[in-house]
Amino acid sequence: MTYFEAFFLALLQGFTEFLPISSSAHLILPSAILGWSDQGLAFDVAVHVGTLAAVVIYFRKEVVTLLTAWVGSIVKKEHNKESNLAWLIVLATIPAALFGLLFKDFIEIYLRSAWVIAATTIVFGLLLWWVDKNATLAKDEYQMTWKKALFLGIAQAMAMIPGTSRSGITITAALYLGFTREAAARFSFLMSIPIITLAGSYLGLKLAMSDISIHLGLLSTGVIVSFISAYICIHFFLKLISSMGMMPFVIYRILLGSSLLVWLALH
């Protein structure tokens, strides 16, 4: 991997991780279309660290409040809306964690292909359009219930299918349940913290148990670039989502998926 490839892939990871357009698709496509070699386990860990740091630092006040309330609910049996939301985020993490443990190898072998990415990019883009068009946009994240959180957790589990988009499918599910765009995005981003932590820890453990050589310069590039791009992306997405809606991302997904289908048909 060259420094240009590291910069480009980290930039892609940062910008696409929290937009409803699928980060996995954008990381798979350069190798499929440009013939780049796989970025490797160490680089995967690096960009996970960068994007996780971005969302934790951006939501640092909310994270501290939720963690404090969550610990208080365990230690002091104190329950409030913050502790309730924290427990619901934990609940929403369980389906994806179980799905990952059970089906990760199957997905890696059979679904990590450009054809699957093209199909899911278009299908889930159209689903996002339909749901956003018909959404009531009335609830905030503190009106979350355990049934709604579990529904969002199942949606997050589906995001393991390449091209689906974790933020895309969870925001789609939240809009379907009647949440505002801002609340849907905030809960989706907060949901990402435990699942990215689990995924990064799993990859880090695999890396520690392997004999893979580590290039600190490339890894530093991955962490820094993915952090900066993810932080910027979160900031502007939350500021603009209410006014612009989901249509720009729907159009992008349809164009990307259609272009990929044409490219595959010609090759």
Curated annotation (Swiss-Prot):
The chain crosses the membrane at residues 1-21, 39-59, 83-103, 111-131, 149-169, 189-209, 218-238, 246-266. It is found in: Cell inner membrane. GO terms for biological process: cell wall organization; peptidoglycan biosynthetic process; regulation of cell shape; response to antibiotic. Its EC number is 3.6.1.27. It is a multi-pass membrane protein. The keyword Signal does not apply. It is an enzyme of class 3 (hydrolase). Catalyzes the dephosphorylation of undecaprenyl diphosphate (UPP). Confers resistance to bacitracin. Belongs to the UppP family. This is Undecaprenyl-diphosphatase. It comes from Aliivibrio fischeri (strain ATCC 700601 / ES114) (Vibrio fischeri). The gene is uppP.
